[in-house]
Amino acid sequence: MNIKELYYYHDLVRTKNFSQVASDFNISQPTVTMAIKRLEESFGTTFFMRDRSHHQLTVTSTGLQFDQHVQRIIEELEIAQKELARAKQECISFGLPPIIGSWYFPRFTPALLQAGLLNQLEVVDHGSASLLQLLAKGELDLALLGSLQPFQQPSLRARVIDKAPIRIIVAKDHPLAAFEDGVSFAQAAQYPFITLDDEYIHAQAFCQAAHLARVRPKIVFKTSDVQILKALVANHSGISFLTDLALDDNDGLVALPLTDGSQPEFIISLAARANRLLTPNAQRLWSILETPLYK
C-alpha cells in the first residue's frame, strides 16, 4: 500500500469526483482510478459504487468506515512530520496560558537559566483549551495547563504539579471584605461580577459554582485580560471569581474563600502527547518543571 493512495482515497471520499482528486494532486485521473482499485483489491471489498449513467459516485458503508481509519493515519503522519522536524531543532515549543505564564512560571526561570534552557523556549501563549488542542495536533512539545480536574485522557501524558484555590475577589474596602473567614457563592451573587471569558477555565468554574448555589449572578463585563479584570474590581466596578495565584500584594484586592461545601481548585498540570518522544532538551525542561524543589 502506497501512503499517497490514502491521501487520494480520503480526497475522493470528500469530493466524490475522480477528476477533482486528480486536479488536487496534479496527477492523471487513471492514476487515481488505479490507486482506488488497488485499495479495494487489497481489502477485498468495494469502497465506492459508480453510477456511470448519472455520473455519480457513492461511498459504501465499508468505504466510510475505512475513511475513518485513513483520517487517523493521515493525522498521525502529519503529526510525526511536525515532531521529527522539531526534533532536529534545539528550540522547545512550549504552551503557556496567561495566568500560569505571568504568576506561576517565573519561579522556574532561575533553574531554566542555569540549565541553559530559557533561551530555547518557543512560547505559545493561549488559553489551556487551545493549548490542549495544539498538543493533540503535535504542534507543541509540552505545555503547562490549567484545569478544574486532573487530565485523564489516554492520549495525554499529564502530571499535576500544583493547585491553587479559586476565590471571590473584592476590593479591600468592599462590604464583603469584612467576611475574612469566607462567603457563600449565593452571598457573593448579590453583587455584579466581572469575569474572565471562555478562554479561561474560570468561566467553567463560575458556571459550576452558580449551578451548585442555584443562583444566576449578574455579569456586567467579560475580559480576556487579567490585569483589566483586577483593575475594575479594585475600582468597585464589580467583584470576581479568580485564583488567588493571580493576585499581587499591590492589587488592592482581597481573596475570600468560599464557605460552600465544594470549592473549585485551579489545577496546574505539565502535559505532553502520550506517544511523543521528547527531545533531550524537552525532557530536561519536563524534569525541572515537575520537581518540587523549583516551585
Place the predicted regions along the sequence by residue.
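Short helix-boundary/capping micro-motifs
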Residues: 12-28
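Alpha-helical linker/hinge and terminal dimerization helices associated
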Residues: 42-43, 66-87
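Beta-alpha-beta core module
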Residues: 152-159, 164, 227-277
